[in-house]
Amino acid sequence: MLPHLPPHIVQSSRLLQCKCGTPLALRFYQHDGDDYRLLTEMYQGFEPKEQSQGLPARLEQQREGWLRYMANKGINLLAIMEGKVVGHAALFEMEHGLRYEYLIFVHQDYQDRGVGTALTEMIKELAQEMGFDQIWLTVAAINRKAIHVYQKVGFCIVGPRDFECVMMLPLKQGDPR
């Protein structure tokens, strides 16, 4: 279970401009309000479905179960542009207090605008502030764009495979890269 987020973090948001100059808001998922509906709408229009380890699920019922799980068990960060959720990043605890898994999806109509980089940088800052040791993820080995973004933020490949790369972001001083 992830640690409880302090209110000053949950209520924080960041206003930026994407590469094309459109305003971009980053904020943490709120359980009260429209966030679940907005997140569901993003994933309904997300293509291709099941592109990353079967996610997001093609079937609506499975996708909604996955979204409810993330909303309740993870730290979720939303990217909002033009009144819509266009990106979603989340952290999940894998080893108590040590390792946290990272996932991110940016809607295909909003890729290559800096949304993924902004989400990843804000998640990294949060993890450092909360004292996490490391964040890890898996990414398709052919997804060069995503690998480039992760490396730019500080992730390194620690376990290449034929179809996937395991990447890790050390957050403590002295962690090997």
Q: What does each of the following model-derived ranges do?
A:
Residues 103-112, 139-140:
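A short, internal acetyl-CoA/4′-phosphopantetheine-binding micro-motif in the GNAT/acyltransferase core
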Residues 1-23:
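Acyl-donor-binding surface of acyltransferase catalytic domains
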Residues 33, 44-103, 107:
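Acetyl-CoA-dependent GNAT
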Residues 22-41:
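A short beta-loop-alpha structural element at the N-terminal edge
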Residues 117, 121, 141-159, 163-165:
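Conserved active-site alpha-helix within GNAT-family acetyltransferase domains
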Residues 112-120, 127:
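Glycine-rich acyl-CoA binding loop
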Residues 127-138:
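Conserved GNAT acetyl-CoA-binding A-motif
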Residues 172-177:
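Short, charged/polar, Gly/Pro-enriched secondary-structure boundary elements
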